[in-house]
């Protein structure tokens, strides 16, 4: 065999564990057809975090409007994009150097499985004892007329100028996070959602808070709508619509155009304009249409049919050892269908576990409680047992902690910050929902508490850095412990 293990994909699902296998003496090949590092490093989390940061700061500054803030806080998107491109471009180069440092072989091109022990990359064929699929997910593009006009998350995170009026199809992570950026940039957008709720895996009262904030900033929501087609129009003038049919073709006076009476943005002529038609008759116009309808397994053309391995949009079904139905083929990261949230942190956990598994040192994989965050402005986070389960079960109590109203957090004027903490009958914390500007940090704190089974009494014996959102939240847990 040429290699002990071939990884198809170079993201966190592969190299995080591959380096340990190489250190143990195994010969490793990583196959990559695009940039080293995968989606998160190059066209996902990292890009989004950098582009979002100035708007987060702007929102915090706006909290002091009329009580300390002077002047306007403006974000220069083109300059921000230059910074993003510079930073992200360095990521693939950084990993290329790291792969050399770890003594990992790399083949650049699409990896195709020919049989259970052979992978082809271009004209080269490599034999291997085991194969690990780490191909990740790709954006879902609906099979509808005009889908060639759709942009996915990769496009938006590399756009030179923000659209004047975007239409976002989807109300999940991507759709809501992009809507927040557009709202803070003072632009308009329509969000089309197929079901009756956005961010269905997050605490709905907090989601509704976000929706109301976005509505106040010219983001409109259309629920229970299915997009039928997308049409590219001639040069037109687009109003700011909230109507069933918007028709502003040449010859129509702008005064005749139905428009949102609360709109704060004037009509503008767009060089490119698109009409999005829905089954209900809803018709919207904009200059940029984003497909934010989720992601699906990126396995087309990988050759799974050559080994009789099937998959779904959720990926390859694996057992508790991340092993597929073909014994020597494994899956790690987003492409593994495990029922666990598809997050980069989970991919890292799986990759490190798989290194132990392939060395014969592991039992079935065990997942800690996984925190999840949607980076809207403000953030929403969830970890452990959801509040709605706690509210419906006699096994739990749900305590609402409005820590933003504590005097320490008022220094940041984040007055709406709060958490709903789920405790069991023994007063052990088993879950939390957080709504705050710094929700991700508080979620990580709760994840640590839950995973390490730290009791309320033990928390009460600790001393924390103050003032901080976590310290105030923890102090208020004292009231649960002593039933104040």
What residue ranges belong to the model's regions?
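Glycine-rich dinucleotide-binding loop and its adjacent helix/turn
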Residues: 45, 135-188, 220, 305-307, ...
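Short hydrophobic core segments
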Residues: 6-8, 111, 126-136, 169, ...
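Mid-to-C-terminal Rossmann-like scaffold of FAD/NAD(P)H-dependent oxidoreductases
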Residues: 1-5, 10-16, 23, 216, ...
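Glycine-rich Rossmann-fold phosphate-binding loop(s) that bind the pyrophosphate
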Residues: 9-12, 33-34, 171-172
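A short, polar/charged loop-to-alpha-helix boundary motif
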Residues: 439-452
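Glycine-rich flavin
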Residues: 2-3, 19-26, 31-162, 195-199, ...
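FAD-site-proximal beta/loop scaffold in flavoenzymes
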Residues: 148-163, 269, 283-357
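A Rossmann-like FAD-binding core segment of flavoenzymes
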Residues: 71, 106, 112-120, 185-320
